[in-house]
Structures are given as C-alpha cells and as structure tokens.
C-alpha cells in the first residue's frame, strides 16, 4: 500500500488530479478540506461530483452537519479508517485538499488527551454556559494558552478547562509534558505549482460556476436550517452570499468579485503555509505533477 498527499492552493486542480490518479492506480481518496466534511454544503465547498464519488471511494466527505464541530481528532480518526480500509481492500491512499493544517498534524501528531471524568465534563459544561466568563477563567489559569486562541473559540476553551480540571495542570504545562506523537511522517507530498494569474482566472471561473449552479439558493437553505452561528457558516463563499442577501453587496457581479478576492487571499495564505511547513515536497506544474505521481505509484 502506498500513501501520498497532493496539496496546492484552492482551485488549483488538486481534486481532478487525485480522481484521475486514483482511477489509474487502484486508490481510495481521503479529502482534507474543512468545508467538504459538512453535509449539505455542496456547491460552495466545490466537492467532487456525484459521479466522481461513485467512481472512487472518498473519505472525509459529508461526515458531519454544519452545526457540529469538526476537530483535528476527528480527521485523524478518518485517516485511520481510510488506511484500514485501504489495507483490507488492497488499495493505495491519496490524501488531497487545501486544509493542509490537517495534513501537517498527521505528520507531526497531536498530544494524547486523558480520559475526562463525567464530573469534570459536567463542571466545565456548566462554566461554558457563559463563554466570556469561561475564557476569563482560562486566562487566569493559563495566560499563555489563552493568548493563542480567541475568546469565541468555545472548542479550545473547553479543551483547556477540561485538561486543567482533570489533570491539575495548566494546558501549556500539560502539552509540554505530553509532546505530540507523529502518526505518519513518511508521506510523500506533491504540490501543484501554479502562477498567480492562472490561479486567479481559475478562481474567478469557479466562482461563476458556483453561482450558476445555485450557490445563493444553497446558502438560503443552510441559513434557514442552521442559522448564521456555526463556524461553517462563516466560510468564504457563504459569508459574502449572506452579505448579498442582506443588501450589503449590491449585485451578482460584486458578489462574484468579493468571493473571488477573498478566495485569492486564502490561496495566498495556503501557499505560504505549504511553503513553510512542508520541506520535502515535490512541486511541479499540473501536467508534470500528474506524470511524476503516476510514475511513483507504478514503481
């Protein structure tokens, strides 16, 4: 069984390469995309088509609902599930997506968490009735840890308080005593190299297709069902559409421009992250990369 990862900025063609290679190299695909994990967020996440999902087994697509939290621990569980099924069915595994933080965590690992008692969980749950107060408590317990998160990050505030009340250690001290353990540090990473002008054109074209496919209708349905509160509803493409529905963005052309601009800014951040976090990657243009991966999978 071979494992590879394909990374690159949003709209660079990662999913297309992955599906093509998977069909030729007997592989399953694990999606590393922070929006594709959500059911019902289909158009704005640019998920693989229904035909592609039928053709190649995918993990990490439609695994939870927009009002539920998706954690890195959940991603690591999905990875283990994908790996086990690949071994069972004698398949290779292709990891692909723009949320490279999850891939980085797969390589560096995360600190193991203790089992939290029912008493501790109940106590923290009560404290979290007032998230602002919970954050202030965390600031007193561990100013260093609190500085790394926002006062609205309920998930990490909860984790910090759970660790403290379960172990008696400030989260920073706990993580120092329990360093991360790598899960798989030997994954070969391939990156799509693409120039800014070409990428911007691809982003603009994809944004137009999203709107034509019914992006606005999708967001209306999501807002009605889940409200605007979940973190997933603050994603690029969703927040701009909500502004359009509110009248803050005046017309479709301006909506396209806003989504394209923010997506291009995201792409730049993704490229910076990939450049600084993954040292031993192979970066090639689309066609060259596909050829290189096919050769590697055949060896």
Swiss-Prot record:
- Record-annotated residues binding ATP? 8-15
Q: Magnesium: is it a keyword of this entry? A: yes
- Where is the segment annotated Interaction with substrate tRNA? 33-36
Q: What is its EC number?
A: 2.5.1.75
Required co-factors: Mg(2+)
Q: Does the keyword Cytoplasm apply?
A: no
SUPFAM superfamilies the record matches: P-loop containing nucleoside triphosphate hydrolases
One GO BP annotation of this record: tRNA modification
Question: What's in the keyword line of the UniProt record?
Answer: ATP-binding, Magnesium, Nucleotide-binding, Transferase, tRNA processing
Site described as Interaction with substrate tRNA, positions? 99
* GO terms of molecular function: ATP binding; tRNA dimethylallyltransferase activity
Q: Which reaction does it catalyse?
A: adenosine(37) in tRNA + dimethylallyl diphosphate = N(6)-dimethylallyladenosine(37) in tRNA + diphosphate
Family, per the entry? Answer: Belongs to the IPP transferase family.
**Subunit info?**
Monomer.
What biological function has been recorded for the protein in this entry?
Answer: Catalyzes the transfer of a dimethylallyl group onto the adenine at position 37 in tRNAs that read codons beginning with uridine, leading to the formation of N6-(dimethylallyl)adenosine (i(6)A).
What's the name of the protein? Answer: tRNA dimethylallyltransferase
Which organism encodes this protein?
A: Nitratiruptor sp. (strain SB155-2)
């Amino acid at each position: 069984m071979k494992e590879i990862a394909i990374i690159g900025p949003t709209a660079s063609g990662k999913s297309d390469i992955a599906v093509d290679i998977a069909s030729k190299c007997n592989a399953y695909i694990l999606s590393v995309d922070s929006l594709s994990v959500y059911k019902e967020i289909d158009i704005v996440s640019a998920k693989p088509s229904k035909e592609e999902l039928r053709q190649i087994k995918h993990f990490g697509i439609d695994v939870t609902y927009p009002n539920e939290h998706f954690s890195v621990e959940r991603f690591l569980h999905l990875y283990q599930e994908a790996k086990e099924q690949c071994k069972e069915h004698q398949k290779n595994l292709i990891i692909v997506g723009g949320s490279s933080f999850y891939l980085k965590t797969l390589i560096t690992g995360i600190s193991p968490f203790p089992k939290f008692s029912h008493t501790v969980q109940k106590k923290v749950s009560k404290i979290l009735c007032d998230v602002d107060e919970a954050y202030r408590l965390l600031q007193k317990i561990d100013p260093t840890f609190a500085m790394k998160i926002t006062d609205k990050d309920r998930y990490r505030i909860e984790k910090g308080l759970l660790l403290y009340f379960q172990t008696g250690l400030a989260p920073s001290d706990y993580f120092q005593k329990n360093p991360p353990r790598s899960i798989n540090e030997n994954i070969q990473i391939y990156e799509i190299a693409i120039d800014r002008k070409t990428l911007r054109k691809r982003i603009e074209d994809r944004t137009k297709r999203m709107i034509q496919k019914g992006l606005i209708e999708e967001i209306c349905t999501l807002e009605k069902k889940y409200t605007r509160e979940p973190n997933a509803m603050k994603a690029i493409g969703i927040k701009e559409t909500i502004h359009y529905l509110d009248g803050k963005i005046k017309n479709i052309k301006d909506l396209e421009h806003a989504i394209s601009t923010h997506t291009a800014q995201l792409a730049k951040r993704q490229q910076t992250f990939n450049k600084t976090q993954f040292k031993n990657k192979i970066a090639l243009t689309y066609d060259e990369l596909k050829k290189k991966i096919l050769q590697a999978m055949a060896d």
